[in-house]
């Protein structure tokens, strides 16, 4: 059975109500050609099914391992690069960007277990999510989780051209577990994750990943190193 995310309940209710009224109007004899009426009926039905599909929230079994960095989102890896992170770390980090299309699951998950050390919401623009400046210009959130061994991972939810609503659930000081649901972005977006330079990257450009399942990187604790 399709499990629906809580963020979609109001949107689904309102959308299906509007689509129902449209179809009732078509059935009731709005003056249109048969071909147009049929096309509108099929289109509205497909749209309703897509809205239900978009807000799906599949159950996932998480294979938790402390040294692993799991993907925080479903989507395609569109960037892997070394960059200066100027909001929290203020030093060079490895940035991995995951683009979420409107057909991906949009649940966001914690890549590691630890404590939420930092969180900030940034209002902004709505450039397309794959635009180079979207990570600094768009509406976004920045969150940092600290592992028990002191290693910190920053991940950033970025709204895209369609997405205009970011949700992040934990509060600073909360304990989060690897693979736990921590947020949601509606209708197409991007998620950036910033890792230490010594991280052993496990993904490639254009690779498709699944939140809470795909291994993004490995970071051994300082004791193991």
UniProtKB/Swiss-Prot annotation:
Modification after translation (UniProt): Is synthesized initially as an inactive proenzyme. Formation of the active enzyme involves a self-maturation process in which the active site pyruvoyl group is generated from an internal serine residue via an autocatalytic post-translational modification. Two non-identical subunits are generated from the proenzyme in this reaction, and the pyruvate is formed at the N-terminus of the alpha chain, which is derived from the carboxyl end of the proenzyme.
Catalytic function, reaction form: a 1,2-diacyl-sn-glycero-3-phospho-L-serine + H(+) = a 1,2-diacyl-sn-glycero-3-phosphoethanolamine + CO2
Membrane topology: Peripheral membrane protein
Coiled-coil region list: none
Superkingdom classification of source: Bacteria
The UniProt record lists the keyword RNA-binding: no
Keywords: Cell membrane, Decarboxylase, Lipid biosynthesis, Lipid metabolism, Lyase, Membrane, Phospholipid biosynthesis, Phospholipid metabolism, Pyruvate, Zymogen
Residues with the Pyruvic acid (Ser) modification: 189
Disulfide bonds: none
GO molecular-function terms, A-Z: phosphatidylserine decarboxylase activity
Record-linked InterPro entries: PS_Dcarbxylase (IPR003817), PSD-A (IPR033175)
Acyltransferase listed as a keyword: no
Cofactor annotation: pyruvate
EC number: 4.1.1.65
Compartments where located: Cell membrane
Listed GO CC annotations: plasma membrane
Cofactor info, note text: Binds 1 pyruvoyl group covalently per subunit.
Sites marked Cleavage (non-hydrolytic): 188-189
Active-site residues from the entry: 189 (schiff-base intermediate with substrate)
Pathways per UniProt: Phospholipid metabolism; phosphatidylethanolamine biosynthesis; phosphatidylethanolamine from CDP-diacylglycerol: step 2/2
HAMAP family linked to this entry: PS_decarb_PSD_A
NCBIfam families on file: PRK05305.1-2 (NF003678), PRK05305.2-5 (NF003685)
Protein family (similarity comment): Belongs to the phosphatidylserine decarboxylase family. PSD-A subfamily.
Quaternary structure and partners: Heterodimer of a large membrane-associated beta subunit and a small pyruvoyl-containing alpha subunit.
Name of the protein this chain belongs to: Phosphatidylserine decarboxylase proenzyme
The species this protein was found in: Amoebophilus asiaticus (strain 5a2)
């Amino acid at each position: 059975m399709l499990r629906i995310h809580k963020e979609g309940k109001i949107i689904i209710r309102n959308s299906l109500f509007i689509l129902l009224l449209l179809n009732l109007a078509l059935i009731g004899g709005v003056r249109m050609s048969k071909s147009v009426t049929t096309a509108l009926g099929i289109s509205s039905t497909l749209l309703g099914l897509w809205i239900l599909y978009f807000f799906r929230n599949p159950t996932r079994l998480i294979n938790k391992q402390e040294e692993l960095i799991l993907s925080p989102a479903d989507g395609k890896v569109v960037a892997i690069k070394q960059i200066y992170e100027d909001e929290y770390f203020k030093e060079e980090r490895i940035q991995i960007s995951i683009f979420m299309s409107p057909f991906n699951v949009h649940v966001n998950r914690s890549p590691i277990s630890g404590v939420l050390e930092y969180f900030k919401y940034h209002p902004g623009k709505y450039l397309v999510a794959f635009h180079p400046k979207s990570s600094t210009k768009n509406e976004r959130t920045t969150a940092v989780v600290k592992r028990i061994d002191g290693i910190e991972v920053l991940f950033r939810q970025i709204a895209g051209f369609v997405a205009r609503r970011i949700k992040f659930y934990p509060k600073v000081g909360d304990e989060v577990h690897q693979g736990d649901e921590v947020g949601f972005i509606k209708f197409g977006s991007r998620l950036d994750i910033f890792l230490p330079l010594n991280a052993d990257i496990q993904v490639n450009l254009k690779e498709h990943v699944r939140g809470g399942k795909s291994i993004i990187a490995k970071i051994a604790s300082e004791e193991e190193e």
